[in-house]
């Protein structure tokens, strides 16, 4: 066999396997939602992606890394050479183990850390455990999220409001605070925002508010740490096929079946389509001049309509 043939990369597989489009099977799950029970299974492998060692030698922490966007990001980070710690809830242990196997199949280390990000002490502990395992922390991805669809604001209870804010924005602030105690110049903090934080969502008042707060805090923190050589950015996805929506009690199985059909591209994103944006923002080779940015990956939706 010639060298030319041996060195030729494989053809991308995605063109032969189009991303799934609605309608999907009608389905519902209890919170927090389990990826292995979703039909169809979300795609996270990004088989057509070609890694280039952009994160070689880095240590990353990804909250909500057991499933959805977090899993896809954690696995792609590993493919780019990073060791990865992932945070998850007790009910998500099975999904977390699948993520661990996927990371270790890339020859990288994976640390599973179980706990509740609504608790301030755990936000400190998850960072401390990551540093103890890998000796450092170069990349923080604050990704775990909670949502409650409501027909009206009056339906939203104080308990639901507090859990959404504690999970989505308080945890981000606390994780960043803990991470900055050990991060050095060249490190990167990335948060998962949402189209709802830019355009709003009448059915997700508290969730949208937290995502808007994430955008504001990202821009503020970026200014705060720019002199330390640490970059802070966010990714704002449109609809993504993850367990988050089928596990929302306010989302009927019939709505899940049509999920993502109302965006211009006509379908929800697969997690593997979001992960490269996080690699881009984590990599100093790609985005050393980018900080304080909310990168929109929204399937054609724009703030201008």
Task: Cite the ranges covered by each PLM segment.
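A glycine/serine/threonine-rich, flexible loop-to-helix segment
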Residues: 204, 227, 239-263, 304-305
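A conserved structural motif in NAD(P)-dependent oxidoreductases
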Residues: 263-274
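Alpha-helical segment proximal to the catalytic Tyr-Lys
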Residues: 181, 223-227
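Active-site helix of classical SDR
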Residues: 176, 210, 218
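Residue(s) in the substrate-gating loop at a strand-loop-helix junction
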Residues: 194
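Catalytic Tyr-X3-Lys loop
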Residues: 154-173, 190, 214, 265
């Amino acid at each position: 066999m010639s060298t030319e043939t041996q060195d030729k990369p494989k053809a991308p597989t995605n063109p032969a396997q189009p991303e799934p489009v609605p309608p999907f099977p009608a389905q519902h799950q209890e919170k927090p939602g389990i990826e292995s029970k979703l039909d169809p299974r979300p795609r996270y492998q990004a088989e057509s992606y070609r890694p280039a060692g952009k994160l070689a030698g880095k240590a990353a922490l990804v909250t909500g890394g057991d499933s959805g966007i977090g899993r896809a990001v954690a696995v792609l980070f590993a493919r780019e050479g990073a060791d990865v710690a992932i945070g998850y809830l007790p009910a998500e242990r099975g999904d977390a183990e699948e993520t661990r196997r996927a990371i270790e199949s890339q020859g990288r280390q994976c640390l599973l850390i179980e706990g509740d990000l609504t608790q301030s002490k755990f936000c400190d502990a998850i960072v401390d455990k990551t540093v103890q395992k890998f000796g450092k922390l170069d990349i923080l991805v604050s990704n775990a999220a909670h949502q409650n669809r409501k027909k009206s604001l009056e339906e939203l209870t104080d308990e639901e409001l507090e859990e959404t804010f504690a999970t989505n924005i308080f945890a981000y602030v606390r994780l960043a605070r803990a991470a900055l105690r050990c991060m050095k110049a060249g490190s990167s903090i990335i948060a998962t925002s949402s189209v709802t934080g830019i355009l709003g969502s009448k059915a997700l008042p508290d969730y949208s508010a937290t995502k808007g707060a994430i955008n504001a805090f990202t821009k503020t923190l970026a200014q705060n740490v720019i002199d330390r050589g640490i970059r802070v950015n966010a990714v704002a996805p449109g609809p993504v096929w993850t367990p988050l929506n089928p596990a929302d009690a306010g989302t009927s199985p019939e709505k899940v079946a049509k999920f993502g059909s109302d965006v211009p591209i006509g379908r929800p994103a697969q997690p593997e389509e979001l992960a490269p944006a996080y690699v881009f923002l984590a990599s100093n080779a790609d985005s050393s001049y980018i900080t304080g940015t909310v990168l929109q990956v929204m399937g054609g939706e724009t703030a201008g309509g």
